[in-house]
Amino acid sequence: MLKPFVSITKPGIIFGNLISVAGGFFLASQGSVDGGLFLATVIGIALVIASGCVFNNYIDRDIDRLMERTQGRVTVQGLIPPGVTLAYGGVLGVAGFSVLWFGTNALATAFALLGFVVYVGLYSLYLKRHSIYGTLVGSLSGAAPPVVGYCAVSGQFDLGALTLLLIFCLWQMPHSYAIAIFRFHDYRAASIPVLPVERGVRAAKHHIFWYILAFLGATLMLTLGGYAGYGYFAVAAAMGLYWLVMALRGYRAGDDQVWAKKVFIFSIFTITALSIMMSIDFQVTETEVLMTSLR
């Protein structure tokens, strides 16, 4: 009875995002962790992400029927009525934003709202189906959680928060393009205009390489900017360089789908490792404020 209501929130996506939230939170905490604030941040953003996933499942129920990997989803199988799905998503969203508003600060809540609006309002409702740039715009929603975690502590949008936003936006691109390559036939069957389908797999390989290169540079900026230590720097450099080598191997890959799946899997290891390292290898620093919380 309850299983469909859990499944529709995409627990795996929530868990993955909470790792990045924790990374941003502990990076900003600089060793002085407020347990209550951490709990409010994690619960609030988890509920917001769950809400976004529920709405995404509702919106995508027609194209999910056409894709092999999504044909078993709750909304496709009719396990939860559409009206109940919408109400459920709404309740989760209100609960999540309320927890963030009362438990953290306005700036953290604003970035959570930005991510939600981009994911549900821009990406899911329109860009995913109509534009090759859907992945690019959607990357902003995937980059919001670590910034929420960071701003929940700092109450300000500084260069550290900006660097996190850049890192996670850049990471989303090769991660998503790799999915689109090894699930190429699904995306083509559903007429979703992702880059590999619209411009070809080789063009996507070019983009994957350059985005990983940019991602590598962005990750190192956390140390060069004085926010993370050299342990983080070493891990970021090693993971980024190996991911870059994997991208180069794609030009000689005998099976693009096998290669892309490896790139995708390693992307998860990479971002998880960086989130953990920034949590434990932080630097205490004075930062230049770009934006402060309203309260």
UniProtKB/Swiss-Prot annotation:
Principal location class: membrane
Gene3D superfamilies: UbiA prenyltransferase
Keywords: Cell inner membrane, Cell membrane, Heme biosynthesis, Membrane, Transferase, Transmembrane, Transmembrane helix
GO cellular component: plasma membrane
Highest rank taxon of the organism: Bacteria
KW Signal (keyword) present: no
Pathway: Porphyrin-containing compound metabolism; heme O biosynthesis; heme O from protoheme: step 1/1
GO aspect biological process, one term: heme O biosynthetic process
Membrane topology according to the record: Multi-pass membrane protein
Protein location: Cell inner membrane
GO molecular function: protoheme IX farnesyltransferase activity
Protein task: Converts heme B (protoheme IX) to heme O by substitution of the vinyl group on carbon 2 of heme B porphyrin ring with a hydroxyethyl farnesyl side group.
UniProt-recorded name of the protein: Protoheme IX farnesyltransferase
Species name: Chromohalobacter salexigens (strain ATCC BAA-138 / DSM 3043 / CIP 106854 / NCIMB 13768 / 1H11)
Taxon lineage: Bacteria, Pseudomonadati, Pseudomonadota, Gammaproteobacteria, Oceanospirillales
